[in-house]
Amino acid sequence: MFKVIKKQGRARRGQFQCAHGGMVQTPVFMNVGTQAAIKGGIDAFDLRDQLGCQIELSNTYHLHLRPGDETVKALGGLHKFMRWDGPILTDSGGFQVFSLASLRKIKEEGVTFASHLDGHRIFMGPEESMRIQSNLGSDIAMAFDECVENPAPYDYAKASCERTLRWLERCKAEHDRLNSLPDTVNPQQMLFGINQGAVFHDVRVKHMQQIAKIDCDGFAIGGLAVGEPTEVMYEIIDAVEPYMPADKPRYLMGVGTPSNIIEGVARGVDFFDCVMPARNARHGKLFTWQGTMNIKNAQYKLDDGPIDPQCDCPVCRKFSRAYLRHLFTAQEMLGMRLAVMHNLYFYNKLTERIRQALDADEFDAFRAEYSRKLAEKV
């Protein structure tokens, strides 16, 4: 299922087999299509044919509310619904539920919260999250967990991790049951557990040791990139990584910048996701191999060159900086679409180049050249 084929330091070059789309090459960036679509007018055919996407990520909470997971199941599952034949990971809905701080109530059974759409009350617990994700038919389901706010009191973070551990045990039991049903959409669906613990190293390590005993198909580090300093995030990864099973994929949830990805790989992480490339693109902020740029700046008004001379994406091959700036200035929808295409291609190409560097035993040199450079402004 998952195999590490090469290492350089803690950085891992691997392969991961999914029910859809064949072998995933890792490290990998997962393109975030929250509601079975990437904001900016990007469809499954763009992802597959033009942007180099290996895995798409969709959101359990949003799809449960609209169009409804039962609807998606009736239409053959998420792959058929969005016409994507590659792997899909669905998050558990936990992050969205717990971000509704003023609208939810936590109990041992699960969480009662108000829909952000119309305010009606919804209950979601481990079993409900597993059933929704089973209906969606994703390749990878994420366990239902509590993502505590930052900063969080030590005692609360500790108690929350104990509850999240119990929830993972319930997720595992329900997930196994659902996969055995004759009418399940994807009987090969996998389950990843999630490490929590806020910024407290001892809580994080103990929780990782506990969840590693449960037979999950992979493990994630959650609850980061929520306001803590970048160095604190790296320190937490350093603390937790030694206790993550070496034979299972490791996923750093919601992270991050290109530099974060390079540094995450250096610390033994295999999977990444983030809304940043698409979100930034919709505001004219683009990633290049020279650093970040704001295409709306006046300096690009007469610039006939590509966004990035070192990029071979469909946008850089065809359009100029001046044209893209004009589209944003004129508020044309095409501007957002082209910008999102470029940024997603860049992120997918970044992880491809990381894999190539690992294959060639040149990751340390790649990291030294690009980790700081990609964070600079052009």
Predicted feature residues:
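Structural signal for hydrophobic packing residues in well-ordered secondary-structure cores
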Residues: G137, L168, K172-H175, N179, ...
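Non-catalytic, usually N-terminal nucleic-acid engagement modules in DNA/RNA processing proteins
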Residues: M1-V185, A298-K301
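Glycine- and acidic
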Residues: N150-P153, K158, G218-L224, M333-M336
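A non-catalytic, amphipathic alpha-helix used as a structural packing/dimerization or gating element
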Residues: E128, I132, L136, A159-R170, ...
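C-terminal extensions of enzymes
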Residues: M1-Q15, V24-N31, G40-G41, D145-P151, ...
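Conserved, mostly hydrophobic/aromatic
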Residues: G22, E56, D91, Q133, ...
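Short, well-ordered coil loops that connect the C-terminus of an alpha-helix to the N-terminus
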Residues: C53, W84, S138, C216-D217, ...
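Glycine-rich phosphate/ribose-binding loops and adjacent secondary-structure elements
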Residues: E162-L165, E174, L178, N186, ...
